[in-house]
């Protein structure tokens, strides 16, 4: 049987879907549960779980510290997750992938520009409508309109430019390290999933990951 390797994104430990699937209410509990399962899988089955260093590792540890996770959990992260920097100079990526990424990025930028233009038109129209009936104070009109429009703009702009694509160095490092190690990617991120598929990498949704490891362990115990 081929040695099983997994490459973890931060969401593999911290995502809310993971907590719900494990039936726990906070990140401290879910992180500890996941790390215990990872430790058992390593000791009993030689299944290794890797994390890109220092991008994803730093992101994960920072998140756990902010959530006031127990020091013991952080020690487990250091002990059972294999920290490795992707060999960015040696990993070969097909040129077609870069072409698709640039094309996708260009389309998103154009959509973002159209959203910006629409937001400006909506702001001007709302300001005109609000100021016309009773000639409201200029600052009140601007504050009322801008707060509403800016919030709407941020949501639309973020979803258009960042949803379903790689938007950070840690995201890219997860894919590069997984490709280098021939490991399955573990994440709950639409962009990582999409580009993992394009790179021909195995993908495991973060909420399913603990149960997959547990299934391996249960089968081993039955032997």
Curated annotation (Swiss-Prot):
**Transmembrane region(s):** none
Q: A Gene Ontology MF term for this entry? A: ribonuclease P activity
Keyword field contains GTP-binding: no
- Known EC number(s)? 3.1.26.5
Q: Which GO terms describe its biological process?
A: tRNA 5'-leader removal
Keyword set for this entry? Endonuclease, Hydrolase, Nuclease, tRNA processing
Q: Where is the signal peptide?
A: none
Name of the featured protein:
RNA-free ribonuclease P
Please give the organism. Answer: Methanococcus maripaludis (strain C7 / ATCC BAA-1331)
Q: What is the lineage of its organism?
A: Archaea, Methanobacteriati, Methanobacteriota, Methanomada group, Methanococci
């Amino acid at each position: 049987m081929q040695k099983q390797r997994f490459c973890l994104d931060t969401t593999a430990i911290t995502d809310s879907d993971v907590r719900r699937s494990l039936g726990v209410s906070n990140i401290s509990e879910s992180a500890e549960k996941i790390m215990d399962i990872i430790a058992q899988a390593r000791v009993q089955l030689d299944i290794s779980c890797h994390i890109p260093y220092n991008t994803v590792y730093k992101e994960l540890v920072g998140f756990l510290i902010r959530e006031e996770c127990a020091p013991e959990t952080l020690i487990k992260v250091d002990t059972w997750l294999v920290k490795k920097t992707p060999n960015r100079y040696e990993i070969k990526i097909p040129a077609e992938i870069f072409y698709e990424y640039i094309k996708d990025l260009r389309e998103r930028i154009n959509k973002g520009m159209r959203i910006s233009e629409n937001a400006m038109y909506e702001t001007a129209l709302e300001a005109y409508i609000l100021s016309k009936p009773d000639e409201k104070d200029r600052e009140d009109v601007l504050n009322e309109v801008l707060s509403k429009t800016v919030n709407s703009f941020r949501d639309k702009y973020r979803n258009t430019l960042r949803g379903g694509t790689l938007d950070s160095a840690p995201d890219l490092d997860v894919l590069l390290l997984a490709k280098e190690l021939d490991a399955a990617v573990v994440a709950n991120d639409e962009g990582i999933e999409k580009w993992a598929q394009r790179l021909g990498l195995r993908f495991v949704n973060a909420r399913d990951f603990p149960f997959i490891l547990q299934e391996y362990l249960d089968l081993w115990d039955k032997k």
